């Protein structure tokens, strides 16, 4: 039998934003024994000595005092550097475009932080993610958040059954607008705070400037597949497949896009047209493939839908396992700007089945020059 809410301890991962604030408020109102914990993953003191983490923690303290729950801060900077940031740099070095949010959820929020919560006697860890868990069928299923525009299952695709069984997403069945309303009605300190955007450790800083502090940039030629030089690039790591902005190629006709990379020769390939054939593919290989519940791939093959980037529409695919955590994903048609390093995430209707990392990209049986 399930424990009563008042006998159930829930640790809420609080970021200082409105979503996690409302998650904590709702759980408290439902009678749970709630503890708010702020995670510090990155020392983001800027040149002027200003640290957004300090400001965020102050917001967490204000909200927890308003709700009437205890709060703590916990530091995971070392784990974050080793598991997330190092991975981020390694992927860029390899010419790929990583997704640090996926790795942060897998290694920090729902591993290191979850373990910490359980060590405090917590029954569950709750976060302000827009996703849902369905416990009705014996196994736990992860479902998309009801607010389609805010659904965050894409970033949670690596969570396994063990993690999902200990997780709560209190705002997953709410629209973002309703979350703001609840915060305003309760007069929470974060009710009007704007949402954070971009990669957490870069914040509002310029991406190129930030990355160049850690990886030396190697400028090189920008050219067409026919070998016509169109200019210079600042370093392959700054460009992603399908990118239009920042190429600096003038002239008439359709806009120019990054369509390929040659890491050995340090060449960025460019061509014109949003629907340029060079931007389309029909198959990928994926690594680090994991599933949200056991038995999904017992047959070794499955037809489902997939997303290749956040907020993209779903595409019909066939997934074939080629190793323990490796798969071949064949598209039903062609998809634009599928990018190595990004997440491929699998769905069956509302359910998120799991996902992996896009490795090689193919078209008509030929591997594309995407890294």
Curated annotation (Swiss-Prot):
Q: Which reaction does it catalyse?
A: S-sulfanyl-L-cysteinyl-[protein] + uridine(34) in tRNA + AH2 + ATP = 2-thiouridine(34) in tRNA + L-cysteinyl-[protein] + A + AMP + diphosphate + H(+)
**GO BP terms:** tRNA wobble position uridine thiolation
Question: What are the protein's GO molecular function terms?
Answer: ATP binding; tRNA binding; tRNA-uridine 2-sulfurtransferase activity
The segments labelled Interaction with tRNA in the record are 150-152, 309-310
Region Interaction with target base in tRNA: what ranges? 99-101
Question: Where, subcellularly, is it found?
Answer: Cytoplasm
Q: List the disulfide bonds.
A: 104-200
Q: Where is this site: Interaction with tRNA?
A: 129, 342
Q: Does the keyword DNA-binding apply?
A: no
Enzyme class, top EC level, equals transferase
The annotated active site, in chain numbering, is: 104 (nucleophile), 200 (cysteine persulfide intermediate)
What keywords appear on the UniProt entry? Answer: ATP-binding, Cytoplasm, Disulfide bond, Nucleotide-binding, RNA-binding, Transferase, tRNA processing, tRNA-binding
Read off the PANTHER family from this record.
MITOCHONDRIAL TRNA-SPECIFIC 2-THIOURIDYLASE 1, TRNA 5-METHYLAMINOMETHYL-2-THIOURIDYLATE -METHYLTRANSFERASE
The protein's matches in HAMAP family, at most eight in alphabetical order, are given as:
tRNA_thiouridyl_MnmA
NCBIfam families linked: PRK00143.1 (NF001138), trmU (TIGR00420)
* Family according to the record: Belongs to the MnmA/TRMU family.
Please identify the protein, giving its name as recorded. tRNA-specific 2-thiouridylase MnmA
Gene name, please? Answer: mnmA
């Amino acid at each position: 039998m399930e424990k009563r809410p008042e006998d159930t301890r829930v640790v809420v991962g609080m970021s200082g934003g409105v979503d996690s604030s409302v998650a904590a408020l709702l759980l408290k109102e439902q009678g749970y024994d709630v503890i708010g914990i702020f995670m510090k993953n990155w020392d983001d003191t800027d040149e002027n000595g200003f640290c957004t983490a300090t400001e965020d923690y102050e917001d967490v303290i204000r909200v927890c005092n308003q709700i009437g729950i205890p709060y703590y801060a916990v530091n995971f900077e070392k784990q974050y550097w080793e598991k997330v940031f190092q991975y981020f740099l390694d992927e860029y070095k390899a010419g790929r475009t990583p997704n640090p949010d996926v790795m942060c959820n897998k290694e920090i929020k729902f591993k290191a932080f979850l373990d910490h919560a359980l060590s405090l006697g917590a029954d569950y860890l709750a976060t302000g993610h827009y996703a849902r868990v369905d416990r009705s069928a014996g196994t736990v299923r992860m479902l998309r958040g009801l607010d389609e525009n805010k659904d965050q299952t894409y970033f949670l695709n690596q969570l396994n059954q063990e993690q999902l069984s200990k997780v709560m997403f209190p705002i997953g069945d709410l629209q973002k607008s309703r979350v703001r309303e609840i915060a305003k009605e309760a007069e929470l300190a974060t009710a009007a705070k704007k949402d954070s955007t971009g990669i957490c450790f870069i914040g509002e800083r310029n991406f190129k400037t930030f990355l160049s502090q850690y990886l030396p940039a190697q400028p090189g030629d920008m050219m067409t597949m026919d070998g016509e030089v169109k200019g210079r690039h600042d370093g392959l790591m700054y460009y992603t497949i399908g990118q239009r902005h920042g190429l600096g190629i003038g002239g008439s006709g359709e806009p120019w896009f990054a369509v390929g990379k040659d890491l050995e020769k340090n060449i960025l390939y460019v061509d014109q047209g949003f629907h340029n054939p060079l931007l389309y593919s029909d198959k990928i290989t994926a690594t680090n493939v994991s599933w949200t519940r056991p038995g999904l791939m017992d047959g070794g093959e499955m037809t489902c839908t997939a997303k290749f980037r956040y907020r993209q529409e779903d595409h019909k695919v066939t997934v074939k396992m080629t190793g323990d955590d490796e798969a071949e994903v064949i598209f039903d048609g062609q998809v634009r700007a599928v990018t190595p390093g990004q997440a491929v995430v699998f769905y069956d209707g509302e359910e998120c089945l799991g996902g992996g990392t896009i490795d090689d990209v193919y078209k008509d049986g030929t591997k594309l020059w995407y890294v």
